[in-house]
Design a protein with these regions (language model features):
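Conserved small-residue-rich beta-alpha loop and adjacent elements
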Residues: 108-174
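Short loop-to-beta-strand entry elements in the cores of soluble alpha/beta enzymes
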Residues: 210-212, 232-243, 259-282, 298-309, ...
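Conserved small/polar residues in nucleotide/adenosyl-binding loops
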Residues: 433-440
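C-terminal core of ALDH-fold dehydrogenases
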Residues: 322-430
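Conserved NAD(P)+-binding/catalytic subdomain of aldehyde/semialdehyde dehydrogenases
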Residues: 181-258, 262-267
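N-terminal Rossmann-like NAD(P)+-binding subdomain of aldehyde/semialdehyde dehydrogenases
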Residues: 1-124
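Alpha-helix C-terminal capping segments
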Residues: 143-154, 177-179, 197-203, 221-223, ...
Length: 442
């Protein structure tokens, strides 16, 4: 990995390079994505069956698009018992963590006759997108379905691209069943997002779409936002490690590579105050890469978006971490919890040398669907909050409104909204409205 002395110019150049990976930069694909969406919107099932044949090589129709109970049973027979046990253990941790995020309706009343509150309601229908492609991610199935279940979503459907044989990966099906999905449809890509957003004869329209995907999926989610809600427009995966001289270089190198193997556009960055550590990590990375199964992908990722940055001070290092706002941030310093108090921008923060990033990907419990491309400055991880909506509750009695109604009228008249003012006045000023009979006090 390249080692760079951290300067303002270096930081600016790296940020510019990283931001090129954002889905917002893929304008050349938008026309094709919009064409797919409009075709699905107009031709519904016929369009998604055609695209599935064209892109996935699978013959899908109205009779077989929905995964059956027999197919799920077959998937259980194919999945290793040890993997099933691990999925169930992870599910317990993920559910336990997200249970703590539950929100409840509340009401506050006063003797004067004022009742104010907030009504929390779960979304009715949610669509979860699960990618196929270069790798299979049953962990993403759990991370997207569990918070929706905890929130109380009534119907959760999942879409995922089939193989050429028309089948869905067994681990994906088992994870979905264990998490509590209601239906699984064999359709992927931008066409799946369009089907969930607008509905077809086979695929129901939903209120929100969540889940990761490729460039086409990301741009499709961006295009249908407003017709439905979405979680986020995720970019390629990212890891940043903030370390001092106390860090174990082998641990750091291994953790950087854990994200670099996702795809060629993933980023892996070490920020350190120790030149010695920087050089040791670079050597360890070189040794590890040669041994790993996805070494070609890893090497391309490191060549394009891998950096080791050497800072003059920890303050300078932390400033860089906050500016880049990585999806995953590991803190491997002498006092990592003290360091954590200075971190403002990161999707997930892994504290201490044994809190490796894959722990969060699979098992610990916090959600691994995280903001990318610097959006951790203003976005949060996927949570129960993403699957609820809130309504304000306002109730005033006559006795509560009468003492302050003229204040409201004054506000309305200031904004020249006379109908607003009349809406309040009509309840108390009989002389202004002689044709009305005002309600009497109870």
């Amino acid at each position: 990995m390249r080692i760079i002395e951290l300067t303002e110019e270096a930081r600016t150049n790296i940020l510019e390079n990283l931001l090129k990976r954002s889905p917002n930069s893929y304008g050349e694909f938008e026309g094709r994505v919009n064409e797919i969406i409009e075709n699905v919107r107009a031709n519904r099932d016929a369009a998604i069956f055609d695209y599935t044949k064209r892109f996935d090589g699978a013959d899908i129709n109205a009779e077989n698009i929905l995964v059956t109970e027999d197919e799920i049973k077959e998937a259980y027979e194919k999945v290793d018992e040890k993997l099933l046990t691990v999925i169930r253990k992870a599910l317990v941790n993920i559910r336990k963590y997200h249970e703590k995020q539950r929100q409840y309706s509340w009401f506050d009343s006063e003797e004067s006759g004022i009742i104010l509150g907030q009504k929390v309601t779960a979304l009715e229908k949610v669509g979860v997108y699960v990618p196929g492609g270069k790798a299979v991610y049953p962990s993403s199935v759990l991370m997207n379905i569990v918070p929706a279940k905890v929130a109380g979503v009534k119907t959760i459907v999942m879409t995922t691209p089939p193989g050429k044989d028309g089948k869905v990966n067994p681990a994906t099906l088992v994870a979905a069943k264990e998490a509590g999905v209601d239906a699984i449809y064999k359709v992927g890509g931008a066409q799946a997002i369009a089907a969930l957003a607008f509905g077809t004869e086979s695929v129901p329209k939903v209120d929100k779409i969540v889940g990761p995907g490729n460039i086409y999926v990301a741009l499709a989610k961006k295009a249908v936002f407003g017709f439905v809600s979405i979680d986020s427009i995720a970019g390629p995966s990212e890891i940043m490690v903030l370390a001092d001289e106390t860090a174990n270089p082998r641990f750091v190198a291994a953790d950087l590579l854990s994200q670099a193997e996702h795809d060629e556009m993933a980023s892996a960055i070490l920020v350190t105050t120790s030149r010695d550590l920087a050089e040791q990590v670079s050597k360890e990375v070189e040794g590890f890469v040669a041994q790993l199964s996805r070494k070609e992908i890893i090497q391309k990722s490191l060549d394009n978006y891998g950096y080791i940055l050497v800072a003059e001070s920890m303050d300078e290092a932390i400033a860089t971490v906050n500016e880049i706002a990585s999806e995953h941030l590991e803190l491997v310093t002498k006092n990592p919890f003290e360091t954590m108090t200075k971190i403002r921008n990161a999707g997930a923060i892994f504290v201490g040398e044994y809190s490796s990033e894959p722990l969060g990907d699979y098992f610990a419990g916090p959600n691994h669907v995280l903001p990318t491309n610097g959006t951790a400055k203003f976005f949060s991880p996927l949570s129960v909050d993403d699957f609820i909506k809130k309504s304000s509750i306002i109730s005033y009695s006559r006795e509560a409104l009468e003492p302050i109604y003229k204040d409201i009228v004054q506000f309305a008249e200031c904004e020249q909204l006379t109908a607003h003012a009349n809406s309040i006045r009509v309840r108390f000023e009989a002389d202004s409205y002689p044709h009305l009979t005002l309600p009497t006090k109870a």
